[in-house]
Amino acid sequence: MKLKRYLLVAKPGIIFGNLIAVAGGYFLAARGSVEPMLLLATVIGLSLVVASGCVLNNCIDRDIDRHMERTRGRVTVTGQISLKAALAHGLVLGVAGFGLLWWRTNPLTTALAGFGYFVYVGLYSLWFKRRSQYGTLVGSLSGAMPPVVGYCAVTGQFDAGAASLLAIFCLWQMPHSYAIAIFRLKDYEAAGIPVLPVARGIAVTKIHIVLYILAFMAATLALCLGGYAGYGYLLVAVAVSLWWLAIALTGYWTADDRLWARKLFAFSIVAITALSVMMSIDFQVAPATHLVASLP
């Protein structure tokens, strides 16, 4: 039972979602030439880093979590795990994760994981989530790191493929997160979290959702146009983007915003999972040019 508490505080659902993303980035870069030990180290290392960030986020958010129906049962709120124990748990996970990435991958991969960790814990959790409607945008940078980490673990450099992954996953995060904020609106209002639907209303948020999905659609094409992914990936990318956009547009005449937002959220998971799978299996030879020189 005690072990279960320590598992839950690390948000296993989020860890699993990030596993799919980091694997997608890795396989896209590997192009069929998989090094099992590197893949294992990347997946386990990043999972530990993500788990650490989630634990520290729970520690930071315990004062606002008690006001939200969805989070008031978290072990850091109920006291089933003490603050000191949770902090120690989070720090141990972080040290283990970063240590494994440094040992078995490369400095760039470790630095990217560190950047995502800093953004999530230091910028998003401690400051922007509580004080700004732009918190979601800041948080999207950390949410987009897993596939980039997986990709750069193979290449050791930040090239156009890595930049495309960063754009795709950043842009995906926005409608995904806004959908959650809409169907959990009362929770966010009760906790005083100034997400866009709270700060500017659902009508404005719907406009942002449509615009971000359009931008996401354009970004997904970059992997194919840049020679990183094939036509199978392209077909799936266009299909899921158009379907997601269609769901978003129905929000303008829906009678139930919460139900609509749940549908939008659910399909966002389908969309990003489908893209991660397709980029893993439908890869192409990368172009020789790169945006940024590799790190030693």
Swiss-Prot record:
Q: How does it sit in the membrane?
A: Multi-pass membrane protein
Q: List the disulfide bonds.
A: none
> EC annotation?
2.5.1.141
Please give the start and end residues of each transmembrane region: 7-27, 36-56, 83-103, 108-128, 134-154, 163-183, 207-227, 229-249, 265-285
Subcellular location(s) per record: Cell inner membrane
Gene Ontology biological-process annotations: heme O biosynthetic process
Q: What is its main location?
A: membrane
Query: Per UniProt, which keywords does this protein have?
Result: Cell inner membrane, Cell membrane, Heme biosynthesis, Membrane, Transferase, Transmembrane, Transmembrane helix
Checking Pfam families in the record gives:
UbiA
> Pathway membership of this protein?
Porphyrin-containing compound metabolism; heme O biosynthesis; heme O from protoheme: step 1/1
| Catalytic activity annotation | heme b + (2E,6E)-farnesyl diphosphate + H2O = Fe(II)-heme o + diphosphate
- Annotated InterPro entries: Protohaem_IX_farnesylTrfase, UbiA_prenyltransferase, UbiA_prenylTrfase_CS, UbiA_sf
Among the GO molecular function terms of this UniProt record, one is:
protoheme IX farnesyltransferase activity
Gene Ontology cellular-component terms listed: plasma membrane
Its function, per the record, reads: Converts heme B (protoheme IX) to heme O by substitution of the vinyl group on carbon 2 of heme B porphyrin ring with a hydroxyethyl farnesyl side group.
Miscellaneous notes for this chain? Carbon 2 of the heme B porphyrin ring is defined according to the Fischer nomenclature.
Q: Which family does it belong to?
A: Belongs to the UbiA prenyltransferase family. Protoheme IX farnesyltransferase subfamily.
Q: Which PANTHER family match?
A: PROTOHEME IX FARNESYLTRANSFERASE, MITOCHONDRIAL
Q: Protein name, please?
A: Protoheme IX farnesyltransferase 2
Species whose genome carries this gene = Pseudomonas paraeruginosa (strain DSM 24068 / PA7)
Q: What is the lineage of its organism?
A: Bacteria, Pseudomonadati, Pseudomonadota, Gammaproteobacteria, Pseudomonadales
